Regions:
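Conserved, mostly hydrophobic/aromatic
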Residues: 55, 94, 136
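Alpha/beta catalytic barrel-like cores
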Residues: 1-48, 61, 149, 153, ...
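Glycine-rich anion/phosphate-binding loops
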Residues: 27-42, 66-81, 115
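Active-site capping/gating regions of soluble enzymes
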Residues: 104-181
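Active-site acidic/histidine proton-transfer and metal-coordination neighborhood
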Residues: 70-93, 101, 107-111
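Glycine-rich, proline-tolerant flexible connector loops at the mouths of alpha/beta enzymes
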Residues: 1, 25-26, 57-70, 98-104, ...
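Short, well-ordered coil/turn segments that N-cap beta-strands
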Residues: 8-12, 48-51, 86-92, 125-134, ...
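Hydrophobic pocket-lining residues that define ligand/cofactor binding sites across diverse proteins
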Residues: 45, 82-85, 124, 164
Length: 181
């Protein structure tokens, strides 16, 4: 399949995390797993034609969440993943996603998303990631799906752009979003 994709002019890639699991000592939160054996899997994926990969860290917004433990654990995993992907000659898609589940306000989403993205970049820098060789795939700034205080599309755009300008280094060449928000 990768060769067929390449023949059309598209670039094949693959999701390499193995999913979000309960975070020890914070069971309401998740940490993404899949680092064990990743270097070897990446070699195989590259040989098969993959040129980019994706890893998703998920965060919830509640009264005391996301916790520092969840923020740090997922940011560290995203950085380790990115280092291995760049080492293998591929482009990492770094996806720190603050979920829209819940009753939180757009302002809470802005604050938590900024914190999550900034911590991710702190870890990416510590791990010596070439920021010009990644794609960031964050969430948009939205009120929770159960919030009574929704914001307009214009406010979503404005708050998302403000968050990204505040949190993302200029070296990052691309930012992608889910089509559903």
């Amino acid at each position: 399949i990768p060769s067929i994709i390449s023949e059309t002019g598209a670039v094949p890639g693959i999701k390499v995390d193995t999913g979000a699991k309960d975070l020890a000592n914070s069971p309401d939160e998740k940490v993404t797993e899949g680092l064990d054996g990743l270097r070897e899997r990446l070699k195989k994926y590259y040989e098969l034609g993959a040129r980019f990969t994706k890893w998703r860290g998920v965060y919830i917004i509640r009264e005391k969440y996301p916790s520092k433990l969840a923020i740090n654990s997922n940011a560290h995993a995203l950085a380790r993943y990115s280092a291995l992907v760049q080492e293998s000659g591929m482009v990492p898609i770094v996806e720190p996603e603050v979920l829209m589940d819940g009753e939180h306000s757009a302002e809470d989403c802005f604050i938590k998303t900024s914190e999550v993205i900034q911590k991710c970049f702190d870890e990416l820098i510590i791990h010596k990631i070439d920021l010009s060789g990644i794609i960031l795939k964050p969430n948009m700034i939205l009120a929770g799906n159960k919030s009574k205080n929704k914001i307009s599309n214009e406010e979503v755009s404005s708050k998302t752009l403000q968050c990204l300008k505040k949190s993302v280094p200029n070296e990052v060449p691309g930012i992608a979003f889910l089509s559903g928000g």
